[in-house]
Amino acid sequence: MQAFKKLTSSAIPLWLSDIDTDMIIPANFLTQTTKDGYGKSLFHNLKEKDSSFIFNNPDYSNSEILIAGDNFGCGSSREHAVWALTQAGIKVIIAPSFSDIFFNNAAKNGLLLISLDKDTVKELCDKAEDPKFSMTVDLQEQTVNVDGSIYSFDYDPFRKDCLIRGLDDMTYLIEHLDIIKQFEQSQRG
């Protein structure tokens, strides 16, 4: 997992609520046995149906932040949705709320999800309509900086530490293997 500390990027405005995992990556693209290759299918059906869909706009092709509406990532528990987003270059999603399962999948795969109040997210989304608009996300400080305005966000301390250090669950366990072995031995008596 790639470490994340701070990012300055333009943002993709996607003010839709209840974006489910099937919208993010349709089920017919889930035929691979590896994690690779899902980014090209991100929002496939929406891109095909609507040529003006924001992910068809080349002005946002280098954006690493997505701003969305309520309940992002709802639907099935498919981890492929997170893989598709990260492989398409998304490193941060800002929304008023996220599905719990999606939130956990994102944290385990290095995708930072930030919950801010709905009015603030809508304001940021409106500003992001200008492709030249940018913001800075600082995980260490837990802030989003927009034109000098600073918005603080909460984030689980354990997940924050793992993301800052680039540790997935397995790497974290391996890093603490000696402590785990000591504990297991102490339990045997």
Curated annotation (Swiss-Prot):
Signal peptide feature range = none
Please give the InterPro entries that the UniProt record associates with this protein.
3-IsopropMal_deHydase_ssu, Aconitase/3IPM_dehydase_swvl, AconitaseA/IPMdHydase_ssu_swvl, IPMI_Swivel, LeuD
Alphabetically list the UniProt keywords: Amino-acid biosynthesis, Branched-chain amino acid biosynthesis, Leucine biosynthesis, Lyase
Q: What's its EC?
A: 4.2.1.33
Q: Does the keyword Amino-acid biosynthesis apply?
A: yes
**According to its UniProt record, what is one Pfam family this protein matches?**
Aconitase_C
Q: What pathway annotation does it carry?
A: Amino-acid biosynthesis; L-leucine biosynthesis; L-leucine from 3-methyl-2-oxobutanoate: step 2/4
Which GO terms of the molecular function aspect are on file?
A: 3-isopropylmalate dehydratase activity
Residues in a coiled coil are none
Give the catalysed reaction(s), semicolon-separated: (2R,3S)-3-isopropylmalate = (2S)-2-isopropylmalate
Q: What class of enzyme is it?
A: lyase
Q: Could you tell me the superkingdom of the organism this chain comes from?
A: Bacteria
What GO cellular component entries does it have? Answer: 3-isopropylmalate dehydratase complex
BP terms from Gene Ontology: L-leucine biosynthetic process
- How does this chain assemble? Heterodimer of LeuC and LeuD.
What's this protein's function? Catalyzes the isomerization between 2-isopropylmalate and 3-isopropylmalate, via the formation of 2-isopropylmaleate.
Give the similarity note. Belongs to the LeuD family. LeuD type 1 subfamily.
Name the record gives this protein: 3-isopropylmalate dehydratase small subunit
The upper taxonomy is: Bacteria, Pseudomonadati, Pseudomonadota, Gammaproteobacteria, Thiotrichales
Name the gene that codes for it.
leuD
